Amino acid sequence: MGLLDAKVSNRNVLVTSVDNVMNWARLSSLWPMGFGLACCAIEMMATNASNYDLERFGIFPRSSPRQSDLMIVAGTVTMKMAERVVTLYEQMPEPRYVLSMGSCSNCGGPYWDHGYHVLKGVDRVIPVDVYVPGCPPRPEALIGGLMKIQELIRMEGLGISREEALKKLAEKSVDAQQVLDQTRKAAIA
Amino acid sequence: MSPAVLESKAAYDIIKERFGDAVSEFDANPTMPFFEVLDASRWVDIALYMRDNSLLQFNYLACLSGMDYPEEEKLGIVCNLECIGKYTHKLAVKVKCQRDGGSIPSVSCVWHTANWHEREAYDMYGMVFEDHPDLRRILCPEDWTGYPLRKDYKVQETYHGIKVPY
């Protein structure tokens, strides 16, 4: 929590940067565009349901692209649907983020070779910020991806572009295998 | 022949008696006994007869699928017909047409289910169904090139500027 690190004086005055407040506000009320394409959408709905409770992050699907800042591409993007996805993306105001959820949306999934009708990765038509692997990914994985988007938003700011923010994030990256090993060790101990 | 196939054979015999050379011999396939319509122009008559004859009553078109026979230079359909209610017999009917520019009479006026199924067969194989009320592509986009389930199908390189193959 960026704001909680800021110094609060005894007269309820909060000293922080504009970037900090703006980013905190943006990342705490992400409104994903509410649409699903295939089986991954079921998993996305489960994530939005009470059991996983995305609203604790302020993430709540919005039915209009004009008020959404995040697009979750959940499922198989067919050639027929690709243009509609692009239209939706273009209707979203900036700054906007795209999360590609599941193998189909990432790279065509099981249709990568023989599926003449499937777009081999949604990044062929719109820029993707975060890829969530899996077929379909579990809600935990999607939440992980959403938190990655939040991290990206936190890195951005006035005068700091998305590219620079991504570079900053890359510096902070951790080796997945290392995390797995640590978790396993902790589980055994 | 199993009792189920014998039942289908009995139904076939009634059709054969009425239409003679327009239909082929009976194939006692144990999973799905079938016959072929040799004279495709009589397909609608045969379909109506199969539906309306009180001894046949094939009132349910369970499935209509397309087929490609490149070695015969032909396209075709396979209709899985059943009776719901009085009888339990089942029959598959095959109808073929020329691979290039061929057409098969539509049976969407006989079984309404055929409407969408024939559109699908047209979309995937490219045969024309004569007198179909609404013969448009159903799965692929309207401006898609080629018929994806033909055995010699090659996917197009781009669609509206989007690269298609991997």
Swiss-Prot record, chain A:
Cofactor descriptive note: Binds 1 [4Fe-4S] cluster.
Residue numbers binding [4Fe-4S] cluster: 39-40, 104, 135
PROSITE patterns reported for this sequence: COMPLEX1_20K
The entry's keywords: 4Fe-4S, Cell inner membrane, Cell membrane, Iron, Iron-sulfur, Membrane, Metal-binding, NAD, Quinone, Translocase, Transport
The keyword ATP-binding appears for this protein: no
Required co-factors: [4Fe-4S] cluster
One GO-annotated biological process of the protein: electron transport coupled proton transport
Enzyme class: translocase
Record PANTHER family: NADH DEHYDROGENASE, NADH-QUINONE OXIDOREDUCTASE SUBUNIT B 2
Function description: NDH-1 shuttles electrons from NADH, via FMN and iron-sulfur (Fe-S) centers, to quinones in the respiratory chain. The immediate electron acceptor for the enzyme in this species is believed to be a menaquinone. Couples the redox reaction to proton translocation (for every two electrons transferred, four hydrogen ions are translocated across the cytoplasmic membrane), and thus conserves the redox energy in a proton gradient.
Entry protein name: NADH-quinone oxidoreductase subunit B
Organism: Chlorobaculum parvum (strain DSM 263 / NCIMB 8327) (Chlorobium vibrioforme subsp. thiosulfatophilum)
Gene name for this UniProt entry: nuoB
